[in-house]
A protein has these predicted regions:
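Short coil turns that delineate tetratricopeptide repeat
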Residues: 325-329, 363, 397
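Structural signature of tandem alpha-helical TPR/SEL1-like repeats
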Residues: 311, 315-318, 343-356, 380-389
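Alpha-helical transmembrane segments of multi-pass inner-membrane proteins
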Residues: 1-4, 17-29, 36-148, 210-248, ...
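Hydrophobic alpha-helical transmembrane segments in integral membrane proteins
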Residues: 144-159, 285-316
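TM-adjacent membrane-interface loops and short helices in multi-pass inner/ER membrane proteins
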Residues: 160-198, 205-208, 212-218
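Canonical positions in the second alpha-helix
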Residues: 321-324, 357-358, 391-392
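TPR alpha-solenoid repeat register
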Residues: 331-334, 368, 401-402
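Residue at a conserved register position within TPR or TPR-like alpha-solenoid repeats
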Residues: 339-342, 376
Length: 413
């Protein structure tokens, strides 16, 4: 909290702190869960695992080479799979386990496979010799694949991001630059190249040091080591794999995956003797305290949403006034992007109209045609999407070489 308030970009750090705090809250909360409550929590995760696998299979059959399932992208899905695999194995659901491994193969995440291999090698006694040698083979193949990519942009860019995170951590060693600040501080620590823009450092520990300071990183690392060292092998397998994956990728920077990681790690802790019971004389004050906290959190979140909508409306008003004076393709595109951020079907229809005007005024910008095709696909109008692609290809022949757009979730792909 202190790091967020003292951040040079506190407006961005405070929401990121709230997301991180929600994950940290799961550690004490999990110890208060009874055995039955823990079983129910695992059942929910188990059901969600099946949903993710089936959705990924549907996407794969639909022609998506690296299906992200319901996650941000394939890399995020890979990080989630590492946390779900041990739960499937504990329940002896080998069909789900196989499905998760197939999905992990589809993601093509070398870092995730290295994380899985490292977890297998570290748990030699519990996984058995066959799994141990299979993990060793997978790890060797992963290292070969990583070596083959050594001079590829994705590796070279990671090195730049890691070095930038290190410089940030040195510049603010005690409190860091604030949770969620990496993307906003990055331009000051790397060369001005568009391909180096990134929301995350692609390294959990370096990003933690840069955003929250070295003392926090030491406490966080020591706490995780203490909890995982005493945990049952089947419980710590997933968090260990996710942490190794987090050395070279960003899934633990995504709130939902971080919460799953925190819950998986927290369930390694023994059940508290006190349980979640509250003495009779304290029930009303405790309930009132929880309700007040919930109301404050809800009010804070509501105000953030209102502020975001007001900013969007203000920008829309300025752009509309600008176009009323002189129509411009860039203004039309920006108005469409603002509407698409609201994710309402009516907004999508209006956004399509703005994009039609943008391509009419500037038919040579390929990204406008692609965005228009995405909007029509999201609206369930494949004929219009295909027509937009054909019209765009007449002005931008490069569009003929691109694969057709497939919209998978609630926003443009």
């Amino acid at each position: 909290m202190v790091s967020a308030c003292a951040s040079p970009v506190a407006a961005y750090s405070l929401p990121a702190w709230a997301a991180a705090a929600a994950g940290l809250f799961l550690f004490p909360a999990a110890t208060l869960l009874s055995s039955q409550a823990r079983v129910r929590a695992e059942r929910i995760i188990y059901a969600a695992s099946w949903v993710l696998v089936l959705l990924a299979a549907h996407q794969r059959l639909d022609g998506v080479p690296r299906p992200p399932s319901a996650l941000l992208n394939a890399n995020a899905f890979a990080g989630t799979i590492l946390l779900l695999l041990p739960m499937a194995a504990r329940r002896k659901d080998w069909v789900l386990t196989a499905g998760l491994l197939v999905c992990l193969w589809w993601t093509r995440s070398v870092g995730a496979w290295l994380g899985l291999s490292a977890a297998v090698l570290l748990h030699r006694r519990s996984v058995g010799p066959a799994a141990f040698w299979a993990g060793a083979a997978v790890g060797f193949a992963g290292l070969v694949a990583a070596y083959a990519k050594l001079h590829s942009p994705e590796v070279l860019h990671r090195v730049e991001w890691w070095m930038a995170a290190g410089r940030m951590a040195v510049s603010a060693p005690w409190l860091g630059l604030g949770p969620g600040s990496f993307a906003y501080a990055l331009p000051a620590h790397v060369a001005a190249r568009p391909e180096l823009n990134s929301l995350y450092a692609h390294s959990h520990f370096l990003e933690t040091a840069a955003e929250k300071g070295w003392p926090y990183l030491l406490v966080w690392g020591a706490g995780l080591a203490s909890m995982l060292r005493r945990a049952q092998p089947s419980r710590r397998f997933g968090p260990v794999a996710a942490l190794v994956h987090g050395l070279v990728d960003y899934p633990l920077s995504i709130p939902g995956i971080f919460w799953l990681f925190c819950l998986s790690t927290a369930l390694c802790l023994p059940e508290s003797d006190e349980g979640a019971a509250v003495r009779g004389t304290r029930k009303i004050p405790a309930a009132a305290f929880v309700l007040v906290l919930a109301w404050l959190a809800g009010a804070w979140t509501r105000d953030n949403w209102r502020a975001d909508r007001l900013r969007a409306k203000a920008a829309e008003s300025f752009l509309a006034a600008s176009e009323a004076l002189r129509p411009h393709p860039e203004a039309a595109r920006l108005r469409a992007q603002l509407l698409l951020s609201r994710a309402g079907e009516g907004d999508d229809v209006v956004a399509a109209g703005h994009l039609e005007r943008a391509v009419a005024m500037d038919p040579y910008r390929a990204s406008n045609w692609v965005l228009l095709e995405q909007v029509y696909s999201r609206l369930g109008r494949p004929a219009d999407a295909a027509a937009a692609r054909a019209r765009g290809a007449r002005s931008c022949p490069m569009l003929q070489k691109l694969a057709p757009v497939r919209v998978l979730k609630g926003g443009p792909a």
